[in-house]
């Protein structure tokens, strides 16, 4: 399980309720989370912090999540940072769309609504897979 020392996160989510609930629950776990409502805020946050994982909505008001993910992966030091996509759109249940997200650089693709505890379990799995054996 990630410790609070290695689990700083950025969540890019335009749904205020989901974003704030996630931040509140993670802070109770001792995890530092920076929230961003759109792509511009995400890039600013990523220039100010070095998260171990990024949670990203696919449908953002100013940019498509896949495009933002590609942009993030080009930032210095972010090539290997895991990105977990979340989306409420049934469009992204199609394997071809999910594959496109993975090609954009995602480590995981999850449907919304999703319970924060379920999302935390997925984050733990991604973090475990990155640790050397």
Show which residues each predicted segment covers.
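Non-catalytic signal-transmission and effector/linker regions of two-component phosphorelay proteins
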Residues: 1-10, 117-133
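Two-component/phosphorelay signaling modules centered on CheY-like receiver
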Residues: 16-34
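Acidic, metal-coordinating helix/loop segments flanking the phosphotransfer/catalytic sites
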Residues: 35-53
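Active-site residues of response regulator receiver
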Residues: 57, 87
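Alpha4 helix (beta4-alpha4-beta5 surface) of REC/receiver domains from two-component response regulators
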Residues: 67, 90-108, 121
